[in-house]
Amino acid sequence: MWYFAYGSNLNSRAVAEWCRHYGYRAPAMRPGKPAVLDNYRLSFPIFSEYWAGGIGDIVYDPGKYVMGALFDLSENELNVLDAKVNRKLDSNSKEIGTYKRIEVKVSNLGKSDSISAITYQGISVERYHIPPTQHYMDLVIQGAYSFGLSMMWIAYLQSFPLQQGRKPRPPGTGDAASKL
């Protein structure tokens, strides 16, 4: 199953570190291929106590795009990412956590065909900007570099206002979104 990563999940080292800390087997996160999600934009409307700032989300916005990477993951590997992003289901299979899975069409960079993929979108309806921390954005930008995403996209990532003087909390502390 294809998975489209666009935020801190672009950084496989950060995903592996989270998995190690919380006792999960890290997803293989290979092969990663640069990809584009059209008609969405990147935003930071979700506050995480762990990161001490905003964390990435996608918002439907015709004419905009989000760059990221495609990974071929098993359902078990996606379940690990579900735990990482705090995706939860109630007894009626309604998504009630911080993020929900959505199916999207993404373009593999350099190829014209679209691929169906799973990605995560925040459940919160609040859509104002919560500045991320420098540490969080560094992880996102390192992930973007590792997949050869465009310098224009990296400059865009660097343009977001950041939290000043706040440090991320140690793993295992904070709110329900602290695992993010």
Indicate residue ranges for each PLM-predicted region.
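Glycine-aromatic micro-motifs
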Residues: 1-180
